[in-house]
């Protein structure tokens, strides 16, 4: 069975794993990123970690997931807020030159979407749209087991989709951007405005109040459900995926908003699109497994 190396590079920790073509993690190592010590230090750390993997030289390729937009053609980060010094650095080429092995880099949402499309909730389907609803909102379009990157590598990103112009200006995103209205951060912000900072620490506190029957919390969850439905309907009318795969920390509160969201969504799309399904993400380690699937997607032509 073929095996691949997956690298999950974050601002705090870096993980490297050997993964087989069925998505099983055969070996994994984890170390602090130590980004303050510089780009070269982090790259050398990744190289050292890969070399700790048994049989790494027999793997088919290396895939890396990183936090931020990526030029997937050049294998470079376009913006590296959590990894200072990595912006424009030739990550893929540096790793590939060292190991003489095909190496690919993409952002962490795209690799998670890749993992779900190939091995998780979207397995076997030709067009999968992955959405993660967490601190922010991200998306990835996977067609025939490849992430659609677009001209600038930003295809599939949904955070800035406008769901209602009649909202407040929150940050650099558009007024009414779905991330500012329905992400975990947005739910927390709105919950604090309603209930106070002392009662709301995170979105989970809002969900708990809704479960207790608190009318204001239920109303907020209903509004979030509607806003997400607007986003999903906009995506559906452009992409018409076979399935929406939804992951992220906010899904821990799915019992108080997700069915409502899907019901609203069904009223926003025409009859011919009602067969599009919603599924919850299935992979326990979508980041590192999805990263390992990048070389499988690009190198193993029989899998495409």
PLM regions and their residue ranges:
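Glycine-rich phosphate-binding loop of actin/hexokinase-like ATP-binding domains
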Residues: 123-178
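Conserved NAD(P)H cofactor-binding loop of Rossmann-fold oxidoreductase domains
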Residues: 67
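Active-site glycine-centered loops adjacent to acidic/histidine catalytic or metal-binding residues
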Residues: 8, 108, 134
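ATP-binding/phosphotransfer module of carbohydrate and carboxylate kinases, centering on a glycine-rich
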Residues: 1-61, 70-76, 93-103, 115-126, ...
């Amino acid at each position: 069975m073929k095996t691949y190396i997956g690298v999950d590079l974050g601002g705090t920790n870096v993980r490297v794993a050997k993964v087989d073509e069925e998505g099983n993690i055969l070996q994994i190592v984890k170390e602090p990123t130590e980004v303050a010590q510089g780009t070269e230090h982090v790259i050398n750390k990744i190289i050292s970690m890969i070399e700790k993997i048994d049989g790494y030289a027999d793997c088919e390729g290396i895939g890396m997931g990183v936090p931020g937009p990526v030029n997937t053609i050049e294998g470079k980060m376009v913006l590296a807020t959590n990894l200072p010094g990595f912006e424009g650095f030739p990550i893929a080429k540096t790793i590939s030159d060292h190991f003489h092995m095909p190496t690919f880099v993409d952002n962490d949402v795209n690799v998670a979407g890749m993992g779900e499309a190939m091995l998780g909730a979207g397995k076997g389907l030709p067009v999968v749209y992955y959405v993660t609803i967490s601190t922010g909102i991200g998306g990835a379009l996977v067609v025939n087991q490849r992430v659609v990157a677009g001209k600038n590598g930003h295809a599939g990103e949904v955070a800035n989709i406008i769901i209602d112009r009649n909202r407040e200006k929150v940050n650099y995103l558009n007024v009414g951007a779905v991330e500012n209205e329905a992400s975990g951060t947005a739910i927390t912000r709105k919950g604090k405005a309603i209930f106070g900072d002392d009662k709301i620490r995170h979105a989970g506190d809002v969900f708990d109040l809704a479960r207790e029957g608190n009318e204001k919390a239920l109303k907020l969850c209903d509004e979030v459900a509607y806003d997400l439905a607007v986003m999903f309907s906009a995506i559906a009318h452009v992409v018409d995926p076979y399935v929406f795969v939804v992951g992220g920390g906010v899904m821990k509160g799915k019992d108080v908003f997700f069915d409502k969201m899907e019901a609203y969504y069904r009223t926003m799309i025409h009859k011919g699109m009602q067969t599009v399904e919603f599924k919850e993400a299935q992979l326990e380690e979508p980041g590192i497994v999805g990263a390992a699937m990048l070389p499988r997607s690009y190198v193993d032509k029989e899998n495409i």
